[in-house]
């Protein structure tokens, strides 16, 4: 088939209507930069603020296929904090019989029965301890809540700790886009927030270990190559674009080893940090030794660890309790792709070279970013302080200039006792569940996301293979956004140039400049002899 015929077949390509929402709400414990919330950096050596380079459960928009059932979705592929896991280790056969059965009478629908949810709602710990052995504790009710959601929102600590002891999923979101951790932050019990945060990170580590064999097998089957791509960040916030960075990344892949060279260290506080950084993944090493970051300017290296100290966890809890709770959903229900046009008098489909590859350009239509921000747990002082810091950052300031010291937050006074009955809750119309917990203070906004994507049939790497590579380098937050975005059903070809949302106010244009199959000296995947280990070079790894 000729190139012209191929291009004609791609016009007005539309994805299947069955896709639904491909983007789940971003981690609500994150604070989206300039999107109305703020994530403070931890304090490192000498009392200076340090930056979250790899913590993906901050500033995150999560993109994945909508679940086909009410059960929580499967775990996304993320090497650090933001991977979710399945509800528990029970067998599929056991869970198959636990779906609720709706009872219909008089031509109307009666509420489905959720026994685990009911005993959590009523605080029946004894019955819960019995049901927990035979039921799916990660199941969602008709409002999208899991039993853990209800336990946290109602302040039923015993039920919550029992569910966590049986590995109830912490990352799963309800119909409003909130996870149990978000609801715990709203409720304000410090002990519960800490327990959920620790369980979230434990489940993330377990998810990484579970995916490792499949990932190594995929890398081994993929040829050795060199890939170069360019990042250019933009924002519609006045004065912000001038301080946003760009970056040229080089990826080397050999066997089950990957090296990524980058000049962009971080920009989560809106102050671009430049450097000469190399990220090395050694698939032959033990999991605890697999990930290494080299600072090529200072000639030091640090291994990425997953365990956090007690102090680090406590500081993170302080940050969560003093920041807005944020959730963002990129709705793709109405998404479509139409061919971009060029020319003034005689319009024709736009086809241009991107790097070395001929590509067809498409307009991405129907992409809507829906964001929610909650602050019922914050004092007026918290809100004013956060606003002042955000205003400074939007003008090019830096967190370190704020002399920020995290304040040890105490538990909040619990909200008034719940007066809603189980029957009232479960029989409420879907999407209109009576609110449980602290009275909401929530602001919602919607923004249409306009994007362009260039697809090439000439690019030698397939999207599935790219996803395996991006899964390895996902500790870099912006690479994780790219991995999530390309999981959408795209027009034919490989996305050699595309616009992706990174934060609610920031987009990135990613361009694949060069690709070639190649062989490399194995030494580039090892730590140079003259480099010294510095475990505190990147305090947030």
From Swiss-Prot:
GO terms for molecular function: protein carrier chaperone; signaling receptor binding. This is Ankyrin repeat domain-containing protein 13C. It comes from the Eukaryota. GO terms for cellular component: cytoplasm; endoplasmic reticulum; endoplasmic reticulum membrane; perinuclear region of cytoplasm. Keywords: ANK repeat, Chaperone, Endoplasmic reticulum, Membrane, Phosphoprotein, Repeat. ANK repeats lie at residues 111-142, 143-172, 176-205. It holds the Pfam family Ank_2. InterPro entries: ANKRD13, ANKRD13_C, Ankyrin_rpt, Ankyrin_rpt-contain_sf. Acts as a molecular chaperone for G protein-coupled receptors, regulating their biogenesis and exit from the ER. Residues 1-27 are annotated as: Disordered. It is found in: Endoplasmic reticulum membrane. The keyword Kinase does not apply. GO terms for biological process: cellular response to prostaglandin D stimulus; protein retention in ER lumen; protein targeting to membrane; regulation of anoikis. The keyword RNA-binding does not apply. Residues 1-20 have a biased composition (Basic and acidic residues). The modification Phosphoserine is found at residue 411.
